[in-house]
Amino acid sequence: MRYISLNTTIITTTETTGYGAG
């Protein structure tokens, strides 16, 4: 969901697992 997460591996992994970054 967050564009910043794309730059941050840790946040990306968290969102992908929990929110399902899309």
Swiss-Prot record:
One BP term from GO: transcriptional attenuation by ribosome
Keywords assigned: Amino-acid biosynthesis, Leader peptide, Threonine biosynthesis
Described purpose of this protein according to its UniProt entry: This protein is involved in control of the biosynthesis of threonine.
Stated family: Belongs to the thr operon leader peptide family.
Protein name stated in the entry: thr operon leader peptide
Protein source organism: Yersinia pestis
The gene coding this protein: thrL
